[in-house]
């Protein structure tokens, strides 16, 4: 069950079932082409679509809405504003409000392990809202396309990687900066070696550098690269091509590829690396006397609050 602004189940004749969304706060949901394409838009542009708990819960509800709709064949995940997503929200007014006890606290901070203490609480919360939900979206019973632009940082990578296909504007950059800014070993859904390659992953995490859309395309991570002013229309045209594929064939193609990658060790590696991620949090919790679950400038890290420039991973530059 998702805790979000989604209305009650509407049971119709002949077993048809749909969910009618009420007003979302952090995302937008709409359908295109007589409902054959669903578009989910991350809608915190001023915060560069940093992911609050409320956004993630609403995103899960929107994915579920599209999955339950038999008319929908393809789901596009996109974003408003200058960036696809700057990662997890680490201290905005919305984030503080959602976390803080009181009438405005988000319900997700009162369940799924939130009431437990110590490492267990963080482990259960991150497993449910950061890790397991991303795995769930990867296996959504629809074909999904991430339409990305601008910065795709850290947890923003997770949202793109859980989609079946990624299309990018020419100005897109991809980076996971949690190593150099938070002293963490990567985000919770550690798809990096599978998406970037093993050595490129080490380079990007150890430096905090980024790669552009063209290099991501060369790696096979990105399917299409479009000019920024053509991204929206070109993505819809791409989705229309895919929507023509019979639904059973499309789903079995997706499952065949996902099961092959899983047989190669993908899911097992994700599970193991999530535990390593939690060990990293526990380390910082001990080092900081329980004050923080990540590192700070005191330990030689970059000040993430200052939003330091992310440099491109150019082969000729140290």
Curated annotation (Swiss-Prot):
GO molecular function, one term: lyase activity
Region: Disordered, residue numbers: 90-110
Alphabetized UniProt keyword annotations: Fatty acid metabolism, Lipid metabolism, Lyase
Induction, per UniProt: Repressed by Mce3R.
Sections of the chain in a coiled coil: none
CDD domains registered for this protein in UniProt: crotonase-like
Keyword match Repressor: no
Gene3D superfamilies xrefs: 2-enoyl-CoA Hydratase, Chain A, domain 1 (3.90.226.10)
GO BP field: fatty acid beta-oxidation
Source superkingdom: Bacteria
Family: Belongs to the enoyl-CoA hydratase/isomerase family.
Protein's name according to its UniProt entry: Putative enoyl-CoA hydratase EchA13
Source organism (scientific name): Mycobacterium tuberculosis (strain ATCC 25618 / H37Rv)
Record lineage: Bacteria, Bacillati, Actinomycetota, Actinomycetes, Mycobacteriales
């Amino acid at each position: 069950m998702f805790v979000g602004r989604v209305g009650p189940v509407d049971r119709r004749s002949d077993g048809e079932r749909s969910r009618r969304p009420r007003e979302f706060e952090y995302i937008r949901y709409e359908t295109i082409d007589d409902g054959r394409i669903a578009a989910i838009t991350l809608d915190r542009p001023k915060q560069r679509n940093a992911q609050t708990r409320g956004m993630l819960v609403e995103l899960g509800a929107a994915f579920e809405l599209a999955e339950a709709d038999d008319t929908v064949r393809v789901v596009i995940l996109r974003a408003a504003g200058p960036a696809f997503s700057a990662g997890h929200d680490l201290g905005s007014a919305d984030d503080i409000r959602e976390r803080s006890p009181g009438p405005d606290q988000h319900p997700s901070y009162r369940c799924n392990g939130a009431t437990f203490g110590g490492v267990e609480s963080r482990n259960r919360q991150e497993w449910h809202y950061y890790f397991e939900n991303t795995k769930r979206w990867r296996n959504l019973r629809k074909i999904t396309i991430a339409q990305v632009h601008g910065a795709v940082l850290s947890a923003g990578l997770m949202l793109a990687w859980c989609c079946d296909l990624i299309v990018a504007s020419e100005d897109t950059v991809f980076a996971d900066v949690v190593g150099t800014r938070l002293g963490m070993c990567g985000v919770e859904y550690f798809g990096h070696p599978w998406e970037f390659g093993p050595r490129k992953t080490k380079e990007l995490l150890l430096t905090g550098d980024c790669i552009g859309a063209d290099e991501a395309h060369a790696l096979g991570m990105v399917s299409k690269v479009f000019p920024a002013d053509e991204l929206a229309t070109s993505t819809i045209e791409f989705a229309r091509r895919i929507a023509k594929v019979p639904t059973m064939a499309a789903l079995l193609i997706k499952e065949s590829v996902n099961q092959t990658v899983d047989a190669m060790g993908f899911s097992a590696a994700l599970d193991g690396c999530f535990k390593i991620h939690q060990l990293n949090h526990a380390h910082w919790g001990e080092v900081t006397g329980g004050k923080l679950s990540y590192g700070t400038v005191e330990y030689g890290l970059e000040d993430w609050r200052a939003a330091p420039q992310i440099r491109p991973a150019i082969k000729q530059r140290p």
